[in-house]
Amino acid sequence: GDKGISATRKEDGKRFHFPGEGGVMRIEADGSGFEVFARGLRNPQELAFDEYGNLFTVDNDGDFGDRERFVFIVEGSDSGWRANHQYRKRDHNQWLAEKLWKPAEEDQPAFLLPPISNYSAGPAGFAYNPGTALGERHRKHFFLAHSTKQTTAITTDPDGASFKMTGEHQVLKGLFVIGINFGPDGALYGADWVNIPWDPHMN
């Protein structure tokens, strides 16, 4: 989400307080060791590791004519989103004025970890192909379900200390897939929203 993080670690009382930010938290299986791994994300839908343990997500835009972001998540990183950006007008909005939603540019703030690219329209399901069951064509691909009723496959290559998006093709069209995952058999499964209109106030 992106409404904020506020938690106190039980073992030592350390407080993690990041109001108005989405983030990635890390915790041990027994509930200990809570920490905020990365922050400043705008409602990321799912996280995915590649085969080397690099972590990625696709988060949402601010509905200002900006674009969704394909993000490489680094420990300690800040991707720039604050919930109050969404409630400010265009003529005084840090999100737009400082280009926090765009890939790396020289005049962006130094604290920002810029996205790899601007990509997708309403990201939903996101997963990385962990094996070979889908054939050679789809090895080392991320799969992303869009709210525009299409699912695409994308690839990345290292680019300095980050990555660049190097390929994309459509693998499915016409189904409103909102979640995807790989099963133990190596197949890719999706959950379909069908044709129910999206309503943020739906019970």
Locate each region found by the language model.
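Beta-propeller domains with acidic blade repeats across secreted/periplasmic ectodomains
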Residues: 1-203
